[in-house]
């Protein structure tokens, strides 16, 4: 434990918390290029083939990003926009690809929560 004199001289240092989306370097989103598009299986009680992509960001960091929604048009060398947000049942996936921006198309026939999936309003 420090003495009062030591605290007067140095003071206390604040602890620096760990950032959950370090690869974004403080930005809300980052652009990147898909290096690999593949499917992976989730953690124990769940069962599916989740669509994910390895993305090399403009911050020179390569991350694994989830592709939300049903169906996608992504392939290698596609330009994508990546945001933070983990997928609970996929270990190591801490980023999501934004649908409807750059090379990523929106989800077809989406009626609800359209803005999250880049789907345009249907003409009635």
UniProtKB/Swiss-Prot annotation:
Any one Gene Ontology molecular-function term assigned to this protein's record: tRNA binding
Taxonomic path: Bacteria, Bacillati, Actinomycetota, Actinomycetes, Mycobacteriales
Example of a GO biological process term: translation
Protein name listed in UniProt: Small ribosomal subunit protein uS12
UniProt key word Ribosomal protein: yes
Family per similarity comment: Belongs to the universal ribosomal protein uS12 family.
PROSITE patterns for this protein: RIBOSOMAL_S12
Gene3D superfamilies: Nucleic acid-binding proteins
Function per UniProt: With S4 and S5 plays an important role in translational accuracy. Interacts with and stabilizes bases of the 16S rRNA that are involved in tRNA selection in the A site and with the mRNA backbone. Located at the interface of the 30S and 50S subunits, it traverses the body of the 30S subunit contacting proteins on the other side and probably holding the rRNA structure together. The combined cluster of proteins S8, S12 and S17 appears to hold together the shoulder and platform of the 30S subunit.
GO cellular component, one term: small ribosomal subunit
PANTHER family reported for this sequence: 30S RIBOSOMAL PROTEIN S12 FAMILY MEMBER
Gene symbol of the encoding locus: rpsL
Disulphide connectivity of cysteines: none
Keyword Nucleus: no
Source organism: Mycobacterium marinum (strain ATCC BAA-535 / M)
Alphabetized UniProt keyword annotations: Methylation, Ribonucleoprotein, Ribosomal protein, RNA-binding, rRNA-binding, tRNA-binding
Assembly behavior: Part of the 30S ribosomal subunit. Contacts proteins S8 and S17. May interact with IF1 in the 30S initiation complex.
Modified residue annotations for 3-methylthioaspartic acid: 89
Stretches for region Disordered: 105-124
HAMAP family: Ribosomal_uS12_B
Compositional bias per record (Basic residues), positions renumbered to this chain: 108-118
